[in-house]
Regions:
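Cytosolic, long alpha-helical scaffolding segments
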Residues: 1-140
Length: 140
C-alpha cells in the first residue's frame, strides 16, 4: 500500500485478529480430527505475518513523520500499543500453526490432552481482544 492512511492501525489490528482467531479455531478443529484444514492454517499464517509486518511498517513511518498520526488515526502512544498487540497476535498465529502441525502429524492422541488447554487459551484471547477493541483495558 502506497497510501499510509489507506488502512488505519485499528482496522489493521481488527483484520489481523480475525485471521488469527480463525487460525486458532481451525487448529482446535484439527486437534479434534479435521485434518483438511492444516494447509489453510499454514497459508493464513503467512497472511498474518505480512499484516503484522505492515502494521510495524506503518508504526515506524508514523514515528518518522508525526503528521501520519492523523492519517493512521492513532497517536504515537496508541501506535506503540497497536504494534505490541500486532506482535502478540502474530505470535498466537505461530502457536496456532504449531497446534495444526501437531494435530495433523500426531492425530487425536496428544490432542486429547491439549484440547482443553487450547480451548481455554482461545477463550482468553477472545476476551482480551474484545476488551481491547471495546477500549476496556481493565478487562483485557
Amino acid at each position: 500500500m502506497s497510501n499510509p492512511g489507506a488502512l488505519p492501525l485499528r482496522t489493521a489490528i481488527k483484520r489481523l485478529y480475525k485471521i488469527v482467531n480463525a487460525m486458532y479455531s481451525d487448529s482446535i478443529l484439527i486437534l479434534e480430527g479435521t485434518k483438511e484444514l492444516a494447509a489453510d492454517v499454514v497459508d493464513r499464517d503467512k497472511e498474518a505475518d505480512k499484516l503484522q509486518w505492515f502494521i510495524e511498517r506503518q508504526f515506524n513511518m508514523m514515528l518518522e513523520d508525526s503528521s501520519l498520526s492523523r492519517q493512521l488515526q492513532a497517536t504515537s502512544f496508541e501506535g506503540v500499543i497497536y504494534s505490541n498487540v500486532a506482535r502478540y497476535l502474530e505470535r498466537i498465529a505461530d502457536h496456532a500453526c504449531r497446534l495444526a502441525e501437531i494435530g495433523y502429524v500426531a492425530g487425536l492422541i496428544p490432542g486429547r490432552k491439549m484440547l482443553p488447554l487450547a480451548k481455554d487459551a482461545e477463550y482468553i484471547m477472545k476476551e482480551a481482544m474484545k476488551s481491547f477493541i471495546n477500549n476496556e483495558p481493565r478487562k483485557a
